[in-house]
Swiss-Prot record:
Protein name per Swiss-Prot or TrEMBL: NADH-ubiquinone oxidoreductase chain 2
Transmembrane domains' residue ranges: 3-23, 25-45, 59-79, 96-116, 127-147, 149-169, 178-198, 201-221, 239-259, 274-294, 326-346
Species name: Sylvisorex ollula
GO molecular function per UniProt: NADH dehydrogenase (ubiquinone) activity
Record GO biological process: mitochondrial electron transport, NADH to ubiquinone; mitochondrial respiratory chain complex I assembly
Subunit organization: Core subunit of respiratory chain NADH dehydrogenase (Complex I) which is composed of 45 different subunits. Interacts with TMEM242.
Membrane association type: Multi-pass membrane protein
Enzyme class: translocase
Pfam families: NADH_dehy_S2_C, Proton_antipo_M
Length: 347
């Protein structure tokens, strides 16, 4: 793809998300979603092959369906309230429809089927945009309308997402699918706390984007897309592979890494609201995610596969595509757990 075209598309994607973030009118919000969707489809097809075309088509059909449901909900809400203001959600049916539309855009269960397939069909850098930046706009809209959301519906979908995100990743060997199921599980944690403490959900989103971005950047540096190629990276880039191990454990939520912080704060907040069964189930289901992160960590750095002497002398060209943001992102995604008391105080 032409670099100028790619830059224009990225600017359009960011503009669409910014419109959703800044608008208080339903029509402008819908327009921002459509701008975002139409700009990211060529980005998904950056490497032109049948897999990427199939992934872009699946993404388009899912997002278009979600947009139609969103427009229907907006019309119903406007008919009942007589206003186009986002904060004015008076109709319960409109609220449920908007929730379903945004959940479909986010890829939460039971509307999660497109996420692993689309992520697997695109390149690593397109997958990075898909699993990080594309989550901002729907979550920001949920953040704006959280007082009128159906708590039971959100909690059911969040628990289902955490369970499917754990079970789905257990038998995967493709790293992009594993990251997709990881994204589904993390979205479940964010949605669970949305109606209780939306600021905590926002903090969870920031930490999730940081951890996922650092993991994808490390995968891009090593050009690895499967567990087999991941197991051979230690001979080539031991330092990068060690950073990958730490990032994986942080994604799994092991203390004393950053990923433990949002889980800790969400469980604490749910417990404060006299909800004990839900955080217990969420904690148990999170062990499924931790298992396949540990499996990746084990095959990456904790063991050496039987190899011939030739592969132990592997070499590769110096990677010139390392972004300057990689090191700060890795630092943030692994070492800010000591700031938790400060964040609890601010919260």
């Amino acid at each position: 793809m032409n670099p100028m075209t790619f830059t224009v598309l990225l600017a359009t994607i960011m503009s669409g998300t910014s419109i959703v973030l800044l608008s208080s009118h339903w029509f402008m919000t819908w327009l921002g979603f459509e701008m975002n969707m139409m700009a990211i489809i060529p980005v998904l097809m950056k490497k032109y092959n049948p897999r990427s075309m199939e992934a872009a088509t699946k993404y388009f059909l899912t997002q278009a369906t979600a947009s139609m449901i969103l427009v229907l909900a907006i019309i119903i809400n406007t008919m009942y309230s007589g206003q186009w203001t986002i904060m004015n959600m008076e109709n319960q049916l409109a609220s449920i429809l908007i929730t379903l539309a945004l959940v479909m855009k986010l890829g939460l269960a039971p509307f999660h089927f497109w996420v692993p397939e689309v992520t697997q069909g695109v390149s690593l850098d397109s997958g990075l945009i898909l699993l990080t930046w594309q989550k901002i706009a729907p979550l920001s809209l949920l953040y704006q309308i959280y007082p009128s959301l159906n708590t039971n519906l959100l909690l059911t979908m969040s628990l289902l997402s955490i369970m499917i995100g754990g079970w789905g990743g257990l038998n995967q060997t493709q790293l992009r699918k594993i990251m997709a199921y990881s994204s589904i599980a993390h979205m479940g944690w964010m949605i669970a706390i949305m109606t209780y403490n939306p600021n905590l959900s926002l903090l969870n989103l920031i930490i999730y984007i940081t951890m996922t971005s650092s993991m994808f950047m490390l995968l891009i540096i090593n050009s690895t897309t499967s567990t087999l190629s991941l197991s051979l990276t230690w001979n080539k880039t031991p330092i990068v592979t060690t950073m990958m191990l730490i990032s994986l454990l942080s994604l799994g939520g092991l203390p004393p890494l950053t990923g433990f912080m949002p889980k800790w704060m969400i469980i604490q907040e749910l417990t404060k609201n006299n909800s004990l069964i839900l955080p217990t189930l969420m904690s148990i289901l999170a062990l499924l995610n931790l298992f396949f992160y540990m499996r990746l960590a084990y095959s990456t750095t904790l063991t050496m596969f039987p190899t011939t002497n030739n592969t132990k002398l592997s070499w590769q060209f110096k990677n010139t595509n390392i972004l300057p943001t990689t090191a700060p992102l890795i630092s943030i995604s692994t070492m800010i757990l000591p700031l938790t008391p400060l964040l609890i105080t601010l919260n």
